[in-house]
């Protein structure tokens, strides 16, 4: 038996609409499902191992790439209407899933577009510039302060 790939990545957010502005409106992903679900009788909903405390409902948005060749995994953004969500985003050197990364063709141009749209870089462009004056990767913060990376992949030479 073996896993065949990553199905989805779920991110609990404080404000789903703000997160959708980032992932849909700024990054260009497509919402394929957006609904509020009653948590009563959901598998695992009462599990203290899975939830910090019992929740009444959750709002879920499945956010996909438009590229049919590289469509998976998709993102599942969840929030709990009328309830606070706990926790703080972690850094790259802390235990847990530290960030999500998206591939782009031109990181420097993409970074300039993100900054023009008001997205905060996690550092300056100089922080991401290598010895050859290339920018191949950057990190930004999503609306919940979660680190999001954009990279061009490994160099071709």
Give the label of every model feature segment.
Residues 68, 74-79:
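Helix-adjacent hinge/juxtasegments
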Residues 93:
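Long, charged/polar, surface-exposed segments that mediate recognition or autoinhibition
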Residues 77-82, 153:
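Acetyl-CoA-dependent GNAT
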Residues 2, 11, 34, 102-157:
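Vicinal oxygen chelate
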Residues 40-48, 83-88, 123:
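A short, acidic/glycine-rich surface segment
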Residues 12-71, 133, 139:
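Core segments of cupin and vicinal oxygen chelate
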Residues 19, 99-102:
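Active-site scaffold segments
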Residues 8, 97-99:
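Eukaryotic phosphotyrosine signaling hubs
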């Amino acid at each position: 038996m073996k896993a065949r790939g990553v199905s989805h990545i779920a991110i609990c957010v404080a404000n789903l609409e703000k997160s959708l502005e980032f992932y849909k409106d700024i990054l260009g992903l497509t919402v394929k499902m957006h609904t509020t679900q009653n948590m009563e009788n959901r598998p695992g909903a009462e599990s203290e191992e899975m939830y910090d405390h019992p929740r009444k409902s959750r709002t879920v948005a499945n956010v996909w790439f438009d590229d049919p060749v590289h469509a998976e995994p998709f993102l599942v953004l969840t929030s709990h209407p009328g309830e606070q969500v706990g926790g703080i985003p972690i850094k790259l050197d802390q235990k847990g899933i530290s960030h999500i990364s998206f591939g782009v063709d031109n990181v420097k141009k993409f970074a300039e577009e993100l900054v023009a749209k008001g997205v905060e870089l996690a550092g300056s462009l100089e922080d991401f510039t290598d010895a050859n004056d290339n920018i191949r990767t950057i990190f930004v913060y999503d609306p919940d302060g979660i680190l999001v990376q954009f990279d061009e992949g490994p160099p071709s030479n």
